[in-house]
């Protein structure tokens, strides 16, 4: 390494070891029954509103929502929720395409997973057409010939745009081309683009020349003619003669995989596009001499009832003008529009597009004069609307052109055509409501576009929180139909109550209790069931994890002796759990009539919230009991207890009592585990050991694969573990005695002999004295002599 003259400062890693990061102590795991939720998936929630989002709100007969709300209201900050159900199926619906046949499958779900149960039967989905791009087509001509074009110097064409008085003179010169005798469509288009701002041109995928107007309307028109003034005619070489020289003849079928558009905004390669025309009738004759008034025509639109269009002398200031005629028709038009073509003749158009769009003119009934001839419609042949769907192939933003994959089945008159993308909007609603729970706009059924409906709504992070989608036509080639507009209800959602086996679950499939295997929790509760089998499994699960603790309660209706009998089988020498009784009374959030304003619930969630609150304020080594351990939301208890009752429950049954304390409220009044070994008697001791184990386990991962020598052992002992334990001691976790009397660290050659080192073992031993709670307060009150004397005066 080269150094500069002067002071050079280098940063190196040094010999410091990572410090111990305190492990979390109060993330609660809840196994619950709930209104909804993806079964057997541990979902992280940080508020009750989060819980409602994923699992629904309160439901009669279930305690999960009450427990979770109690947890957060009592100081909890983070929980993992697992929904348990018996046999369950999601609600479903099939959305058909307009032409029939299934287009989209819908299931009740959450972020791409099935969310089964009866809750989904209250959902419906509404589909609305929602094209993300719709564009009109300007007048355009596709030349018949294919490049190269045999042009000569000083050749050209004249292009009349929208019946302008003077045509645009397009002239070709040798300098415009690499080889004018073998001119390309792109080279010719570049010359045309420079000729006038009213024209634009491009090359088709088949190497034809396309010329387009820059405006799109019924009056948009292009006509190509031979040039004058001694300029060589290039129209024949380009293929711009006869029908191919007039935009009114439409885009010819042979070359109809491209169109100039008014705007390509919103079109994407791979998207589905619908190319539509609308029913129209164009007057072949100019407006003639006015008839005797009243006069009129009957216009039939899309096969409906005839619309009577009538003209009176009062519609005109004098001799009828085209503007007055248009205004009179527009005042009466229903379902159709009227405009003028480039030559000034009239055109009537249906306001609908595609198949079924029709318009026809007939003489009026009765004494009204027939205005057909006056308006120029004598001999007019109506043209029905058409439509064809295809896949967008390319987008030319600069040239404003769109190409698609296959040729049209019929010629396309740009004046009455549009191209729109095929997208839809899907709204999810609750039954009986018109306000959507969520709405997804711009969805497509094309699999290779970003807005493919199943991809968007099934996204695991940003997808729908109510439904999942499936494509019954996945893998089918070409354009797939969108679901037809309309509202469809979901149905068939069902569920049964979970069995003990469902609550316990399987380690192989990570269901039930084992759904928590992949996440960190330090507390565990199952407020829905007090089944002995489930409680035993939960206690065993926590013990096997070694970092968590179960909190349970006896069933409602048990008296003190019944509670002790219930808890007896769960007691053992070393148990990772605690029991609390009796049930607590809270306000009933489901009561809207005042008939049942309060209800009893198991205290599990509220107790875990107190655990979290007191650990955050005082440290995990502080017993979560006493006057500070108030259960917020609790209005009462199932039965009262005297001091003697509490002592009996705690000493004999190892069950912690919840009772009303005057001046304090409803409090947790003891902190025993179910352990019979006095070393593991208290909740705070169990929690402190779990905390120390987890913290050291997390922070000593750096030791793996390090060279095992005395230097490593010293780093671990003095640089990592010692500062951590000193920090806990200074906060009171080990009492007030000197540090060397309350904890010991052993990490040296005595517990890492060469034989173990050779086998890859690294042994660290930590011993500490956990502070115990003052559980029985003994106050002695007695009299003493005052020492005063009396005397007679």
Where are these predicted regions, by residue range?
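Peri-functional-center coupling elements
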Residues: 177-179, 183, 462-464, 474
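Polar helix-capping/helix-linker motif
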Residues: 446-452, 462, 531, 709
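Phosphate/oxyanion-binding active-site loops and adjacent basic polyanion-contact surfaces
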Residues: 181-185, 318-322, 495-509, 716-717
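Extended, beta-strand-rich, solvent-exposed assembly scaffolds of outer structural proteins
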Residues: 50-55, 70, 90-139, 143-454
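Structured, hydrophobic secondary-structure cores that serve as assembly/anchoring elements
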Residues: 1-92, 429-434, 477, 484, ...
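Long, low-complexity, polar/charged, intrinsically disordered or flexibly structured peripheral segments
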Residues: 470-504
